[in-house]
Amino acid sequence: MVNPQFASNFYFDQRLNTEAVKLLPGEYFVTTRNMVLSTVLGSCVSACIYDGQSGVGGMNHFMLPRGEDDQGLQVECARFGGYAMDILIRELLRNGAHKENLVSKVFGGGNVQRAMVSSMIGSQNTRFVKKYLAERGIPILAADLEGNHPRKIHFFPKNGRVLQKKLYVSRNDTIVEREQNYSRLLLSVAQSAIQPGTREN
């Protein structure tokens, strides 16, 4: 059975002349193939982690640092940073990466929404991803975090190359609306009691 959180939006990028996968919030992707992983980030964060020696790399796209149920257990949903980072690293190792070779590049965490709580989410995501990687000894080779603009990211997992474009437009309603809707949903999940034996997918 395919993990529903594993990105499956494949396309061919004409400009970059390569196979590509677009990641949506709550998705991740790991590959050994010569391709590009792309996403658009507002207050969300993406970690691009790879082993340059083994040629294995992957990326995630998470919206909030952590989600816990009423028992204090981590909600297994890749829209939350704790699980998104854990599963990304686990899949990298399962596909042949070596932990001592892993390095990262991180992006996002922008203050693109009007509400103060949304600005806090971007900063919280930024602090979380830096702390997570530091605690696990995974160096951050490059980072572009926070700020006031959304970002479009193209990550080449075979060699770690990243292309970033900041979206300097006056109205980013699609990105903002999507993140607001997901943020409300995730905050509701994190704060409500989840019945024992159930899982958020």
Curated annotation (Swiss-Prot):
Described purpose of this protein according to its UniProt entry: Probably deamidates glutamine residues to glutamate on methyl-accepting chemotaxis receptors (MCPs), playing an important role in chemotaxis.
Gene: cheD
Keyword hit for Cell division: no
UniProt-listed GO biological process terms: chemotaxis
GO molecular function: protein-glutamine glutaminase activity
EC code: 3.5.1.44
Listed Pfam families: CheD
CDD domains per the UniProt record, alphabetical: CheD (cd16352)
Descriptive protein name: Probable chemoreceptor glutamine deamidase CheD
